[in-house]
């Protein structure tokens, strides 16, 4: 099916723009290809955080939200904002799912196990959502509640769990309904790469109370781990206080609102064909509540079900008979597929997908190039095949290596990406193709926080670049936001964006001078 010059949309995950060169791994890196484009090709900056991407004002962007908005071409109220609003307008406290679960447990005299990421990060969860659940349990005079808390240190400073625990203890003083029964770093509880050896000890802790160490309270445990140079993200599964594991008839409530890092742990309880590891015990739960839908094949009771989206970029390309390829390494595969399609599981007609396995290393600063070279080879083969009108690809390095806080490794990651971009453009040029480059949010352009005097491992609220390589077109605006990408890409293809896409077309064809 050899037809056309492909258009590639390249998403450089975590590649933000920062005027300040200090602690900026992108500015520090040697990037001859990027520098040449920045001097000679049309480019502007796009907003990728806060209100323009459906998040609360000044909330940093993230990969899920970024890809959703790039694909949707309109502002989508994010689950985070939706849940915040429900708390503020009283709908959260009236949510029928929560009431039914608690009423059932009161009747059977069983326990509710609330688990999730205790964090003010707002990327996968927010601790205020947990506090609202505790207030609801208190309102309903239900006190058989056990907390299994995952620690962040990735979307927050590496050692910040004690601040969150202080806030939690203040809430528990007001609403004395629950005890903290386990803690665990997100590295273990929220893996998304089928590294079941990380998830298994979490499952054993939750279902059998098994743990290498036990502490009387969470603070003592965290002080012990900090003393041993273990930061929040890497705290091993640890029993706190008296053992209260999940028993038959109990209910579980997982309060994370973002799906990708909640799926695996959820599947250990709910997947009848689960093969990740041998489960010594499988509690017969009365209910498993997830804050949002994690996967349509995991039958959780969902407190905030998804709002369907029509006419995302993938659907529009498909309805115009165009072929498209989505390609990424494991870490970001869900982002260029599920999230890019508006949180929709289905694959459109003429949409193909390739996943390049991410390397099996403990943390990506140990291999800053990740699988970028393999991804580039596969991408170049796809360009040369001329089988696809549009290719949407994601390079994970700036984000995943940026999250480690290792500056030198992140510089290496950026330099590797520059070489990859150069090779991809060579192939596109040979095939008469065009290239759009952008990012979903910032990260690598700010690697150290003077405010906390710690590595800055989280995302940023900086704008992201939007760069066009291929000649013949120019930008008509000096800035935009992520929702303008899909309409602009459709304009390059000569397609009128559908009315659902409220983003603007930022690109215009150059006029030939008479």
UniProtKB/Swiss-Prot annotation:
Pfam families, A to Z: iPGM_N, Metalloenzyme
Cofactor binding summary note: Binds 2 manganese ions per subunit.
Annotated GO MF terms: manganese ion binding; phosphoglycerate mutase activity
Cofactor section: Mn(2+)
Keyword tags: Glycolysis, Isomerase, Manganese, Metal-binding
GO biological process, one term: glycolytic process
Family membership noted in the UniProt record: Belongs to the BPG-independent phosphoglycerate mutase family.
Subunit structure: Monomer.
Entry protein name: 2,3-bisphosphoglycerate-independent phosphoglycerate mutase
